[in-house]
Amino acid sequence: MVKNAFISVISQEENRGSVEFQVVIFTNKIRRLTSHLEFHRKDFLSQRGLRKILGKRQRLLSYLSKKDKVRYTELISQLDIRELTTR
């Protein structure tokens, strides 16, 4: 498990309450939990936590795509995650 594989996209002076910062933090947690679940497949509580964090990140990305499409596309490309699919 890689514990120190963090994404340093946001500068230190960035507002910690901003949507971009929160999405980066959630992405770090998701990648850490994913690597944990590769070794511990039956850890169902961690699977539940992963699903909750994925939902939170999806809601934040949806909000950002509605408010500022340019910042949304930049963040998606920096974090190397898939774009939201609309229903």
Swiss-Prot record:
Keywords: Chloroplast, Plastid, Ribonucleoprotein, Ribosomal protein. One of its GO terms (molecular function) is structural constituent of ribosome. The keyword Hydrolase does not apply. Pfam families: Ribosomal_S15. GO terms for cellular component: chloroplast; ribonucleoprotein complex; ribosome. GO terms for biological process: translation. It is found in: Plastid, Chloroplast. SMART domains: Ribosomal_S15. NCBIfam families: S15_bact. Belongs to the universal ribosomal protein uS15 family. HAMAP family: Ribosomal_uS15_B. Part of the 30S ribosomal subunit. This is Small ribosomal subunit protein uS15c. The gene is rps15.
